[in-house]
Amino acid sequence: MYDNHLSDFPRNSEERDDSPRIQRAIDATPNGILCIPKGDYEIASPLFIKNRCSLDMHPAARLIATEEMEFVLSYDGNANFHELTVFNEDGSIFDNLGLFIKGGDIDANGKASCLLLANAHHYTLSNITLRNGKKYGLCVGGDAGGRLYELVATNVYCKCTMSGLAGNIGIYTNEYDGHYTDCFVIDYTTGIRADSGLNRFTRCHIWGGTLPPRGKSIKEWSEFYGANKKCVVAKEYTDEVDARILAYGVPEMLVNSVAFELNSNVNVLDGCFADTATIGYLVRGKNNVITNSGFYNNKLMGLRNTLAIKNESLRLVVTNCFFTNPTGTDRFYEGERETITWANNTGDEKEIFNAYFEEQNNMKP
């Protein structure tokens, strides 16, 4: 079901990319649904949604940046969502709670950030892939001003497949009251960063290492990793194999990486997984909760001395979590005892896990 279809908006004779025709289609669909079919679309200038148009994109509809820009696509609800009620021009209440972007694959190609969402109430983002964001995969709020709350983000898949983007962020928000469920971030230096509070992150999985160490090709790295993986499967992982991995170097996007960074208050991580990062959970602010979650460091990636939780917050609750130490060098916690509530957590080496906390923090899990 849609109101307009992109096939009805072909390129004009003088146009050399797809940005103008997609923008025309968006502008012709106020408060409606635009269908974008399968295909590769060259984006040489940024796309803007300012008329509450929703996008229904085929999973193989790819918006590929070909020039430098800030964002490939920006959504701005174009109203003062700081106020309790938004009105139409005729004075009636605007209350369309079904606005969305669904599907598609935005490849910023290292030239831009992928997607900005701003100024909306109960907006849905689902089943979308965000690749190779220069600064962000998904940015919620950012510098756009206004207010976005009750974002429902489901099956958002962020991944970098090209080198040279170290320091970027997969999912960033400085807005409140967002619900992020079943989101995956692969090979962004910071997976998820929340600079505002009251957000809920459920079953979000952050990992990295598919991009190679600097100076190596993706093919070389993939083959090297595969050979070492066979050693693990065959139970032939030796000190010699480990030394070879350490000499090869750490994958580019894992250097100084953080899976989850919480810089504000009352955010909740439930069922989340920090899977191979320099720091799993970096927590500031106060009254944040990490529950039913875990930390793991894939030793084949070459990271050592990783840290599961770095607590710089005024108050942190950690419950029912599982932490692993596959390299024998991974650390579980850094921070003050007085600022953490610790309950029902465990590790794969229970005795080492208990001894660590007793020695480092005089605190028993």
Which residues make up each language-model segment?
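Glycine-rich, low-complexity segments
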Residues: M1-L6, E349-P365
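Acidic Gly/Asp/Thr-rich repetitive segments characteristic of extracellular carbohydrate-active
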Residues: L6-P37
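Flexible, charged surface loops at secondary-structure boundaries
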Residues: I26-P30, F48-K50, I93-D95, A118-N119, ...
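All-beta strand scaffolds that present successive hydrophobic residues in beta-strands
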Residues: I36, S54-H58, F81, F94-K102, ...
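Aromatic/His-enriched, Gly/Pro-containing loop or helix-boundary segments
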Residues: E68-I93
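Right-handed parallel beta-helix
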Residues: S92-D187
